[in-house]
């Protein structure tokens, strides 16, 4: 099954921008027959459990539901490590020396698919 997801950062209460993003992600997933996951990105030092609880309660109160348990980013490091190891073993990881500006400029260039890394540093290391 394919999934949509919403990944809030619990560094404050839910605001209108968060709600808009959550509602769009949820509606698109449900309308297209996909599952919907909630993944809390709690790695930011400003994250607080009380904000997470309030944000999730607000979303539930508005009828936004998700499939399965809430996924907590800080509790998924073993999965991330396994994914990294798999990519490394297949030779698909490499260092990128581009600055954020280089990447932003490449994204604005009139070539290639939007949002796709152009591979500038792929063969340097």
Describe every region a protein language model picked out.
Residues 1-125:
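NTP-dependent nucleotidyl-transfer catalytic core
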